[in-house]
Amino acid sequence: MSEQTINNKETRGFQSEVKQLLHLMIHSLYSNKEIFLRELISNASDASDKLRFKALSNGDLYEGNADLGVKISFNVEANTLTISDNGIGMGREDVIEHLGTIAKSGTADFFSKLSEDQSKDSQLIGQFGVGFYSAFIVADAVTVRTRVAGAAKDQAVQWHSEGEGDYTIEDVTKESRGTDIILHMRDEGKEFLSEWRLKEVIGKYSDHIGIPVSIWTVEKDEEGKETEGKWEQVNKAQALWTRNKSEIEDAEYQEFYKHVSHDFADPLTWSHNKVEGKNDYTSLLYIPAKAPFDMMNRDHKSGLKLYVQRVFVMDDAEQFMPSYLRFVKGLIDSNDLALNVSREILQDNKVTQSLRGACTKRVLSMLEKIAKKDNDKYLSFWKEFGQVLKEGLAEDFANKDKIAGLLRFASTNKDSSEQAISLASYVERMKEDQDKIFYLTSDSYAAAKNSPHLEQFKSKGIEVVLMYDRIDEWLMSYLTEFDGKQFQSITKAGLDLSKFENEAEKEKQKETTEEFKSVVERTKAYLGDRVKEVRTTFKLATTPAVVVTDDFEMGTQMAKLLEAAGQAAPEVKYIFEINPEHALIKQMADEADEEAFGRWVEMLLGQAMLAERGSLDDPSQFLSAMNQLLSK
């Protein structure tokens, strides 16, 4: 086979993140080095899928050979292992893009999280996905020769690197289409220059690949001399999702997940279903155990692999899964879509919408099943994906109740920041006369659990849901009730707990309110339009004053969320509530001098605003008032 260098050779530097990845991978993934073969075979399989799809509209791309497969050979004397495919191949720009850079958003942030702890780094790198670069775990140099299907033989490209700071790329001739990856093995990688070792790894990781994976085997005669070799197919070469569920082992499902997701860890769970009827399709859906590093990034690629009648059509078909389930991996194989379907056609396609609805219900059912049978397992899911699942309340009205049932929060029922309380369990513990689900949103768990707004609830033994994720205030604008019970924010002015008080308490409060009427009026006169209203409150115990908002006015946390997103937030007008039974309020009430009275108001309002917002518009005014009061 005459393959030779032509010209146009250049040396290029790796993107800085590639250099960092290569270094970390070699040192962090060494204990799991055999995964390099899984990654390279998986890439070869993808290249074959893409050729098969493109050849549907241009059969000439097969160049007279439609038998797709992966071939693996080794040379002990030359110390090389070669993985070859006859798939779609790559052009010069493809090679630079795919082998010289990492085209993922948030890459720099990902690398900043890496440490020198090999076990932790290997888990993080597994979430990132390494693909081709895993070759450097076992090789100290890698050569790639590739030609795009349909291109002239002298339009092939050779890429070479020793895994350091740069690589070379040049034009070469290549007789066959597709890609050859030649690994120049390290001493530690020589164990893979063995027929039995290669068969072992392929059987373990790549049995499910839908195209043949073959090894060049050399037989020996009776005298021990090598005879002419032959290609021996090692894997089953049957697409896993087309097989009967009862014939598939859990280990096979787990390895297939790693093929479609490029994750290193086993999935949390999966669901394999063949559906016949109005729509004929097969789905294989996986829920990962760990979130990918860039899941919250807007440019994060998500979606399922789409096959039509077992022919690969596209990766990342996001039309079959709503955004709030973007962590789901897997595939869908439809008999009802056309092979030439495009992303634009999928968007408004009735079949697509039907499959999307079915897949969504399937995933939510999987989650309900885990939550019911294995609480610890579900909480591990929630820790990874809970914030994303919450988005579903705004996106998916049809499944709103199911999503609400899957939510988990902290609450005053448990002295822990762990979000482990379901709304159903809260409702079960509600007091006899309680008809609302009480909740509090805050910046953090510490701020929530120490909020003065909780004092009355603690004294009455009423449980409050504690919410401290950034999106929770926004979330509650879509979650208004659960199981027939309305939600009630405990920082809103409309809060009424009178049903939990006896008549004597109510009468005493009425008398005290009347006594403090003049104090309320003086306070309002001093503050003017800085607050919406001043009034007494009896919901506090150890706190002198708080601020609350009207029921239909934007809350503090929502205003903070908008500001953090760079959006203009309307000014929040607070209601200032004072506790007439607190010593400081009584001291303020006894102050006859209006100037001194004003200092008391400034200090107490400042304290209330700090407790609510964590900041003040004018700290100097608060500090001046406090210093003067302390120096008396």
From Swiss-Prot:
Gene3D superfamilies: 3.30.230.80, 3.40.50.11260, Heat shock protein 90, C-terminal domain (1.20.120.790), Histidine kinase-like ATPase, C-terminal domain (3.30.565.10)
Chain intervals for the UniProt region annotation (A): 1-343
InterPro entries named in the record: HATPase_C_sf, Heat_shock_protein_90_CS, HSP90_C, Hsp90_fam, Hsp90_N, Ribosomal_Su5_D2-typ_SF
Compartment(s) where it occurs, according to its Swiss-Prot or TrEMBL record: Cytoplasm
Keywords per UniProt: ATP-binding, Chaperone, Cytoplasm, Nucleotide-binding, Stress response
GO cellular component, one term: cytoplasm
UniProt cross-references to SUPFAM superfamilies, sorted A to Z: ATPase domain of HSP90 chaperone/DNA topoisomerase II/histidine kinase, HSP90 C-terminal domain, Ribosomal protein S5 domain 2-like
Principal localisation: cytoplasm
Region (B): 344-560
Region described as C: 561-632
UniProt GO molecular function: ATP binding; ATP hydrolysis activity; ATP-dependent protein folding chaperone; unfolded protein binding
Pfam entry (one): HATPase_c_3
Quaternary state and interactors: Homodimer.
HAMAP family registered for this protein in UniProt: HSP90 (MF_00505)
Membership in a protein family: Belongs to the heat shock protein 90 family.
Function text: Molecular chaperone. Has ATPase activity.
NCBIfam families xrefs: PRK05218.1 (NF003555)
PANTHER family: HEAT SHOCK PROTEIN 90 FAMILY MEMBER
Name of protein: Chaperone protein HtpG
Organism the protein comes from: Aliivibrio salmonicida (strain LFI1238) (Vibrio salmonicida (strain LFI1238))
